């Protein structure tokens, strides 16, 4: 599978998970009766069933009859679902949600959802019972991923590590032999200053060596390098060209950080929040810039569901741009005279009868075939060798894609006049 195909598969999986998360976040229990269970892939299913059985027994002590019944029903449903799995969960683990949610008017309904093989591995077993489903761990998995090198240093110590997605991984550390500013007796001021500068230089070389050993081999995978520490130290380190020249060119910024132990790596990520957010959206911004250039000065852009769909069918779309906040369904109608037409509707809206624009024949709402608009477009894109890219709404032109262009656009291989 090519890198582009892997990225598209990952984007599609993330979209499917995002839809489920949004649905789960919409459920509200009247008490602590919504159960969430996160199961890592190494966990024995039999151990999970035993845990659920124990929770079911303990739930009999809940004073509220409604809450007690709801929790026990949820746990029974979870046990039933777990029977479909063998010894262990699938790759990356398994998440099960179950519980009774309010539907209004004092009524409730039951929901059970099973999410297999999330985008990232589930790190630990977790049982959670509350008035809301626990979705935060999954939301973190859907955050934009990147690989960044981290360096924090002062003249006493240094730490280097990785930022992988949202996870900081400290890897190497070093302590310096740089003497304090007060010289020992018997040393001339000039000799002390020279020895101190040599010690500083040696320490900077040691830090650069750690960084080079860690980062150079992966330099083609790294999105950038962040450097933190007190102002004089980090400036001297970067201005002195101690880093490998290819790494030096990858430095995204330097940041004031008070601590240079392992905790300083976390402080560095916090200090670089704006830079990281900007970098995550860089590709989205470049694609939207290309789209607007073609829209105003060229003829290789299309937008809107109908036009983009036509261009997809022609095989003319190089890159399909979809707003990550698009929530629409497409309803396909075929009238009695064989005309195929499509309506784009809100995901929460009902389906209406359709009047064919070509012959005026009416198609009953029940005869329309409804599916998620993004799934519909991505299937066409897969068939035509078109790359699908989800565009964030966290910048101006990304927001415009959703609000002004219907959430769907495309960069074309050639002009079609459509």
Swiss-Prot record:
Q: Which GO terms describe its cellular component?
A: cytoplasm
Say what the protein does.
Directs the termination of nascent peptide synthesis (translation) in response to the termination codons UAA, UAG and UGA.
Tell me which PANTHER family the record gives: PEPTIDE CHAIN RELEASE FACTOR SUBUNIT 1
What is the name attached to this protein's record? Peptide chain release factor subunit 1
Pfam families for the chain: eRF1_1, eRF1_2, eRF1_3
Q: Which GO terms describe its molecular function?
A: translation release factor activity, codon specific
Q: Membrane: present as a keyword of the record?
A: no
Answer whether the UniProt record assigns the keyword Cytoplasm to this protein: yes
Where is this protein localized, as stated in its record? Cytoplasm
Q: How does it assemble?
A: Heterodimer of two subunits, one of which binds GTP.
* Record keywords, A-Z: Cytoplasm, Protein biosynthesis
Family of the protein in this entry? Belongs to the eukaryotic release factor 1 family.
Under HAMAP family, the record lists:
Rel_fact_arch_1
> Quick one: where is this thing mainly located?
cytoplasm
